[in-house]
């Protein structure tokens, strides 16, 4: 749930392991 991935997912996918898309940013926990 925290935006600690430093990645955006405007296309709906995250490349960082363990991160999920909470549009428009990738989050972890």
Curated annotation (Swiss-Prot):
GO terms for biological process: defense response. Disulfide bonds join 5-19, 9-21, 14-26. The keyword Disulfide bond applies. Coiled coil: none annotated. Keywords: Disulfide bond, Plant defense. There is a cross-link at residues 1-29 (Cyclopeptide (Gly-Asn)). The keyword Cell membrane does not apply. PROSITE patterns: CYCLOTIDE (PS51052), CYCLOTIDE_MOEBIUS (PS60009). SUPFAM superfamilies: Cyclotides. Pfam families: Cyclotide. It comes from the Eukaryota. This is a cyclic peptide. Belongs to the cyclotide family. Moebius subfamily. Probably participates in a plant defense mechanism. This is Cyclotide mobo-A. It comes from Melicytus obovatus (Hymenanthera obovata). The lineage of its organism: Eukaryota, Viridiplantae, Streptophyta, Embryophyta, Tracheophyta.
